[in-house]
């Protein structure tokens, strides 16, 4: 399966359980892998035959800004469901990380994989 990869998309949103986390937006790093057939775009060289990186990125940034989840897991699942419903993709991997959130780490996070058919999205 072919992949479209978006790496280290910097999103800002309210996420977390404790008060300091919910008081102001935090920066999140989001990595997205979209599984889809890229052969039509490869043969035609037409942007309409593929998934727009820009549109995906803008959709994710807007969704993170407008939602307020307690867990990264819930945000990741929400983003996966949104992408699977809006774009012509077979599956998606979402990795979300909080930079410098836990002492002595550069970042912590979660990664999920969801399929359109198997997960009924």
Model-derived regions: residue spans:
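N-terminal, polar/charged subdomain of small-to-medium soluble alpha/beta proteins
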Residues: 1-121
């Amino acid at each position: 399966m072919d992949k479209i990869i978006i790496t280290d998309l910097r999103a800002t949103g309210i996420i977390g359980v404790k008060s300091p986390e919910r008081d102001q937006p935090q920066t999140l790093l989001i990595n997205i892998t979209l599984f889809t057939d890229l052969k039509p775009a490869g043969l035609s060289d037409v942007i309409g035959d593929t998934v727009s990186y820009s549109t995906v990125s803008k959709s994710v940034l807007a969704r993170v800004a407008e939602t307020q989840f307690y867990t990264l897991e819930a945000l990741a699942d929400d983003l996966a469901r949104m992408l699977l419903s809006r774009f012509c993709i077979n599956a998606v991997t979402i990795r979300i990380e909080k930079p410098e959130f836990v002492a002595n780490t550069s970042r912590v996070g979660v990664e999920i994989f969801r399929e359109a058919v198997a997960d009924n999205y």
